[in-house]
């Protein structure tokens, strides 16, 4: 039994279609270089992994608490580093079960990468079940992590369309409140025309946040970046941002929180207008 993580680049196929060959090669080169460098500086003792194109498979030696903590730490740090260095958003999943990477005889012109095991299949299938940039967890991995307690602040149980999902976030509210990080995030979202993944990522970053000032600030900053500080000139960007927030695949609780911000912003604007008239 092992823990297996499967990660890949959000929207890679769409990106590839817009790139020339040398741009795609540079993109993948930057992705793999950052992953390798982060791997080297981590204190890894119980993990192995390999990269194929835009995908990264990481697996543990066993299912000990140490192995689980290590794979979660490494996955989280790699995801954050890829975003910080390359503006690459990763999504993925972690599952638990049988897994084996088979050693096979190779020749110089034909290399083999043979893997087998239910844990890999589960992680691969889980990866796309939640439209977000977080890491989806199998139920047993979530339970193991909750028992350890180390990452409980970033673990969430979310019911989406009457089905329970377990998510590990790597983009926190404090991380996104850093101007450079949020600017990169909005740029990617604008390029993707604000797919549900981006709203749901914001939702998980806000989840369980008790500081209302921070919540208000992240929405305020988002609007400012979406319209590039010129709302009257770039109103179409704002319209798209608001309209797409209510797509079917955006988590309902995000829509509720977003509407609360809009109401609050309108009320504040009316109060300011009343004060001016007085």
Annotated model-derived regions:
Residues 1, 132-278:
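Intrinsically disordered, glycine/charged-rich C-terminal tails and inter-domain linkers
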Residues 1-77:
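Catalytic NTP-binding/metal-coordinating core of nucleotidyl cyclase/transferase enzymes
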Residues 2, 87-91, 132:
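Extracellular structured ligand-interaction cores
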Residues 14, 100-103, 143-147:
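Short catalytic/ligand-binding loop motif for oxyanion handling, primarily in non-cytosolic enzymes
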Residues 40-66, 82-116:
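Catalytic core of nucleotidyl cyclases, primarily class III adenylyl/guanylyl cyclases
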Residues 70-73, 89, 117-121:
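Short, well-structured alpha-helical interface segments that form or flank functional binding sites
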Residues 76-80, 111, 121-124:
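Short secondary-structure capping micro-motifs at structural edges
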Residues 85, 96, 118-140:
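Catalytic/regulatory signature loops of cyclic-dinucleotide turnover enzymes
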């Amino acid at each position: 039994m092992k823990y297996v993580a499967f990660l890949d680049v959000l929207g890679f196929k769409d990106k590839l279609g817009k790139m020339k060959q040398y741009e795609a090669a540079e993109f993948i080169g930057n992705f793999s270089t950052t992953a390798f460098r982060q791997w080297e500086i981590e204190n890894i003792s119980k993990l192995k992994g390999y990269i194929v194109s835009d995908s990264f498979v990481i697996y543990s030696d066993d299912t000990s608490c140490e192995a689980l903590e290590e794979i979660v730490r490494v996955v989280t740090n790699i995801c954050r580093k890829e975003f910080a260095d390359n503006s690459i958003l990763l999504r993925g999943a972690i599952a638990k079960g049988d897994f084996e990477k088979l050693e096979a005889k190779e020749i110089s012109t034909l290399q083999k990468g043979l893997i087998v095991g239910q844990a890999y299949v589960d992680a691969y299938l889980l990866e796309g079940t939640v439209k977000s940039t977080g890491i989806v967890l199998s139920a047993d991995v979530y339970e193991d992590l909750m028992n350890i307690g180390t990452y409980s602040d970033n673990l969430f149980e979310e019911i989406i369309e009457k089905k329970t999902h377990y998510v590990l976030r790597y983009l926190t509210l404090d991380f996104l409140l850093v101007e450079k990080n949020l600017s990169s995030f909005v740029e990617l979202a604008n390029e993707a025309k604000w797919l549900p993944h981006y709203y749901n990522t914001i939702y998980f970053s806000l989840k369980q946040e008790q500081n209302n000032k921070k919540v208000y600030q992240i929405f305020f900053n988002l609007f400012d970046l979406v319209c590039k500080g010129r709302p009257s000139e770039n109103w179409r960007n704002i319209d798209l941002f608001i309209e797409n927030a209510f797509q079917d695949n955006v988590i309902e609780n995000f829509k509720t929180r977003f509407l609360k911000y809009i109401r609050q912003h309108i009320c504040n604007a009316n109060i300011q207008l009343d004060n001016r008239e007085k």
